[in-house]
């Protein structure tokens, strides 16, 4: 058993010798003889031939070596095939992961850029809306002040008309009393008050009346009284018409202000709501941008990790492929040597014997 193992080891070493198919058996053996391991195996062969030992034992060992080499290659092929499938699965997964991260980076970059643009537009618009709110509030205040001034003017003028109409009515009563025969002296105090009130108004409408009343104070006659009563009636009618016109103007202005103030209020509400929406949007935009930037950084790191993993896997696969090819080539060379030795031992035994005899004489 020990002898068989020794021969197996020596022959296996010889199997690694570099030879070419174009060489003759003697040349093959000569090449093997130049190698220290080859010299050893040939010494064993020479001993076998000299002692008449069975060459078949060496043939069996060579057959076992060939079988071992073929078996190792089949195992290596199976492992290589399994590793290739696993590698392709890993590569496909990594490429898919890389594509996913690249897609995410593009999407996040677009989100960051579009949101940044939207943020800028919102910030510009919120400044415009803020200015519009200020203008709206100023317009409301100005128009409200104008309306209040109009109303105050109407109140004042309406009160003046009431006072003037009361003065006209009082004057009509005095004149009617004079017409009825009441002495002027009895009505003088009332007359002077009415006259003073009419003069305070400084209205051109009352100038003819004031002149007529002044004349009536110095001379009372029925003709003058009739003219004054007619004049008083005309003036009162004009005052009534003027007061009605002022009231109509007041009501029209009040109605217009109600519509205008409602419009301004609605516009103010809309602007305030728009500003609140924009301010909330600005906050959300900033949050979105921050999150997009952070996610973009994460996705970039994930992409780099995946690309590094892919590079490592590709290097590993290249190394495995190179190792597999080298080992396959080595086994092929070893198998070729074994096959040539088998050929020498089986088909060219006479040439081997001749060479060994010559070798014995020389060495």
Swiss-Prot record:
<feature type="propeptide">
    <location>
        <begin position="18"/>
        <end position="52"/>
    </location>
</feature>
<dbReference type="GO" id="GO:0055039">
    <property type="term" value="C:trichocyst"/>
</dbReference>
<keyword id="KW-0732">Signal</keyword>
<feature type="coiled-coil region">
    <location>
        <begin position="85"/>
        <end position="119"/>
    </location>
</feature>
<feature type="signal peptide">
    <location>
        <begin position="1"/>
        <end position="17"/>
    </location>
</feature>
<keyword id="KW-0175">Coiled coil</keyword>
<comment type="similarity">
    <text>Belongs to the TMP family.</text>
</comment>
<feature type="propeptide">
    <location>
        <begin position="190"/>
        <end position="221"/>
    </location>
</feature>
<comment type="function">
    <text>Structural protein that crystallize inside the trichocyst matrix.</text>
</comment>
<feature type="coiled-coil region">
    <location>
        <begin position="244"/>
        <end position="352"/>
    </location>
</feature>
<protein>
    <recommendedName>
        <fullName>Trichocyst matrix protein T4-B</fullName>
    </recommendedName>
</protein>
